[in-house]
């Protein structure tokens, strides 16, 4: 509620060029507030003859004539102070908003927290479900109407020259597209982009809207931003994270695993050219995040797009090292076997010589000893060649190689290997 300010008892006199006194100013402000909320444009036009359109209204919470002042939301405040246009935008009163703009209301006027009219509209965007195509009951119909009014207000603001790239003065210094990614919908992103919003704008944390959409795994928003030219390989300057790394991190989390979320978002980025082996400032790539999370479908998808399973972080950690950090990963022996088969040289320790925490657990004592022996055992030239062929061509060109190579050789490259075979 950025445009609501709390005032003490000393500052209750109305300010502005007219300097209306006492009950006259209070009554006028209440009437103006009610006219905006009722969308009574005739009354609004008449009241604006006595009240400058860009002058704040001050409403006492004790006022019995203003439904807004009696709202439970504001009971802790003595007065409410806001611009008429901010009130119309926040409560999605399209007719009042248009009337105010036609009478010279400034959409770029900011409240005490540095929010413009557009910022406030986005901060108060209505929450509706995207799972229904048509409303099936009265509640859904009402929510659909609320959403429609919000879109209409947004179009009105844009048509009257609202600055779609204006940053919030405080906090994370979001642009409207960042706010729309957090609070809005993909349609809001599209409307803002149509009106000149910069899709690769960075906020105070150096994140673009695509970074934020990827971080919350919102595929519709990601599709919209990419369609409007968002860079899929732009990195957050403070961390080096790309949209792919953020999406993989969220999808590989416990919540991502439980909800089976994010695979479509990751594939979307990869299909549109995301660099699968891009690394952050710590040298971590998406495959490191995926292996630590241990979610098989994500690891397989990254491998399909030629993720390098031998890439090291700045601390010398390989993807297999990350995978072996967690006991739950190690119990998936089939996935462990596939990763081991692709890893050469097999690097178990980091630059400090430390082993992954998972294989230090007592229950994995025998496995730890076997893996250490395997890491010290040089492979034959034939096995090295097989691993290189598989790592270079991956799953994407698997069927092409099947047509080109003799069946016996192809089977030796792409055949399934169980853990017992690898660790004998």
From Swiss-Prot:
Coiled coil stretches, renumbered: none
Superkingdom of the organism of origin: Eukaryota
ANK repeats (start-end): 80-109, 113-169, 172-201, 205-234, 239-278, 282-311, 315-348
Keywords from the named record: ANK repeat, Repeat
Family annotation (SMART domains): ANK
Assigned GO CC terms: nucleoplasm
Disulfide bonds: none
Matches recorded under Pfam families: Ank, Ank_2
UniProt xrefs under PANTHER family: ANKYRIN REPEAT DOMAIN-CONTAINING PROTEIN 23, ANKYRIN REPEAT PROTEIN
Protein name in the entry: Ankyrin repeat domain-containing protein 61
Organism from which the protein derives: Bos taurus
Name of the gene: ANKRD61
């Amino acid at each position: 509620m950025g445009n609501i300010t709390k005032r003490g008892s000393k500052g209750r006199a109305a300010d502005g060029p007219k300097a209306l006194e006492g009950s006259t100013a209070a009554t006028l402000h209440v009437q103006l507030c009610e006219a905006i909320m009722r969308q009574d444009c005739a009354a609004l036009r008449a009241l604006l003859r006595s009240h400058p359109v860009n002058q704040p209204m001050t409403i006492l919470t004790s006022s019995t004539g203003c439904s807004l002042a009696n709202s439970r939301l504001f009971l802790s405040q003595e007065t409410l102070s806001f611009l008429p246009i901010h009130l119309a935008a926040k409560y999605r009163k399209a007719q009042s908003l248009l009337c105010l703009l036609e009478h010279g209301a400034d959409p770029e006027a900011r409240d005490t927290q540095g929010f413009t009219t557009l910022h406030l509209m986005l901060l108060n965007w209505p929450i509706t479900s995207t799972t229904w195509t048509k409303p099936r009951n009265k509640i859904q119909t009402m929510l659909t109407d609320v959403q429609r009014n919000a879109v209409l207000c947004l179009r009105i603001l844009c048509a009257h020259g609202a600055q779609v790239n204006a940053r919030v003065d405080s906090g994370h210094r979001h642009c409207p597209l960042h706010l729309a990614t957090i609070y809005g919908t993909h349609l809001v992103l599209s409307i803002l982009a149509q009106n000149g919003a910069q899709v690769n704008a960075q906020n105070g944390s150096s994140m673009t809207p695509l970074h934020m959409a990827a971080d919350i795994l919102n595929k519709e928003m990601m599709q919209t931003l990419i369609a409007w030219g968002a860079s899929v390989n732009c990195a957050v300057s403070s961390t080096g994270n790309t949209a792919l790394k953020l999406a993989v991190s969220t999808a590989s989390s416990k919540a991502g695993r439980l909800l089976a979320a994010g695979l479509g978002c990751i594939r979307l980025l990869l299909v549109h050219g995301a660099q699968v082996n891009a690394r952050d400032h710590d040298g971590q790539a998406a495959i490191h995040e995926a292996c630590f999370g241990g979610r098989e479908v994500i690891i397989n998808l990254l491998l399909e797009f030629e993720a390098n399973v031998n890439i090291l972080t700045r601390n010398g950690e390989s993807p297999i090292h990350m995978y072996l950090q967690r006991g739950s990963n190690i119990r998936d022996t089939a996935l462990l076997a596939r990763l081991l088969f692709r890893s050469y040289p097999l690097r178990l320790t980091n630059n400090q010589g430390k082993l992954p925490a998972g294989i230090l657990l007592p229950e994995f004592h025998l496995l730890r000893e076997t893996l250490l022996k395997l890491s010290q055992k040089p492979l034959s030239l034939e096995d090295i060649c097989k691993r290189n062929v598989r790592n270079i061509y991956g799953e994407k060109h698997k069927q092409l190689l099947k047509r080109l190579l003799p069946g016996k050789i192809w089977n030796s490259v792409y055949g399934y290997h169980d853990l017992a075979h690898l660790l004998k």
